[in-house]
C-alpha cells in the first residue's frame, strides 16, 4: 500500500534512524529545526511521485588515503533509510550466514572473531578498499535485482530515483 509505505510514521522511523550519529551535521540540524513539516512535505512528494533527490555534498577525505566523497543531503538520506527499511528484510533472507558487511548485528569485527574460530590461530587477513567502488556499480544490474525480488511498483519507482540519481549533476563543494 503506497500510503502505508510512504506514511508519516514510516518516514519518522527513517528520520530517527538517519539522525543517529549525524545530529551535529549542518544538513541534519537544518532538517531537525522543522522536521515534522519536512517529513510531511516528503510524505506528500513521495505519495504523489514528485520527489526528486536534492543536492549532494562533495568533499575530500585523506584517511587512509585521499578520496572524493559524494554524500547525500540529510533529507535524501531519510528517504534512503525508508527504502532500506523495506528492502533489508528481503535481502537478509538471501544472504549467506557468513556475509558480514553492512548488516545489522554483523560487521568487520564480528567477521574477524568468527574467522579466528574457524581457522588456525596464525591468521592473516586483508581488509581492502576497492577504488571508486560505488561509482563503478552497474546500476542497471542493481535495479534488475530489485525488480526480480520485489513486487511493489512504489519501491521500483523510488529505487529507480535513488539508484540512477547522479550526484555530480547537483552538488555543493565543501
Please identify what each model-predicted range represents.
Residues 1-40:
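Non-catalytic, polymerase-adjacent accessory regions of viral genome-replication enzymes
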Residues 10-11, 42-65, 78, 85, ...:
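Reverse-transcriptase-like RNA-dependent polymerase core
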Residues 21-29, 54-80, 94-106, 126, ...:
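Short, conserved non-catalytic motifs in the polymerase core
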Residues 38, 44-46, 97-98, 103, ...:
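Conserved polymerase palm-domain catalytic core
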Residues 82-86, 142:
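PAPS/PAP-binding and catalytic site of the sulfotransferase fold
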Residues 88-94:
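Short helix-capping/linker segments at secondary-structure and domain boundaries
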Residues 108-112:
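A short, well-structured juxtamembrane/interface segment
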Amino acid at each position: 500500500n503506497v500510503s502505508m509505505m510512504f506514511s508519516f510514521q514510516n518516514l519518522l522511523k527513517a528520520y530517527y534512524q538517519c539522525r543517529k550519529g549525524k545530529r551535529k551535521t549542518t544538513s541534519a540540524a537544518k532538517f531537525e529545526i522543522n522536521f515534522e513539516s519536512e517529513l510531511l512535505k516528503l510524505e506528500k512528494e513521495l505519495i504523489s511521485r514528485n520527489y526528486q533527490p536534492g543536492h549532494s555534498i562533495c568533499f575530500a577525505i585523506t584517511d587512509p588515503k585521499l578520496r572524493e566523497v559524494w554524500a547525500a543531503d540529510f533529507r535524501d538520506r531519510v528517504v534512503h533509510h525508508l527504502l532500506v527499511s523495506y528492502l533489508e528484510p528481503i535481502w537478509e533472507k538471501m544472504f549467506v550466514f557468513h556475509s558480514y558487511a553492512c548488516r545489522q548485528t554483523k560487521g568487520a569485527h564480528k567477521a574477524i572473531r568468527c574467522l579466528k574460530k574457524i581457522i588456525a590461530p596464525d591468521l592473516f587477513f586483508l581488509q581492502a578498499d576497492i577504488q571508486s567502488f560505488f561509482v563503478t556499480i552497474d546500476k542497471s544490474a542493481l535495479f534488475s535485482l530489485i525488480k526480480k525480488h520485489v513486487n511493489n511498483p512504489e519501491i521500483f519507482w523510488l529505487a529507480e530515483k535513488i539508484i540512477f540519481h547522479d550526484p555530480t549533476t547537483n552538488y555543493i563543494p565543501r
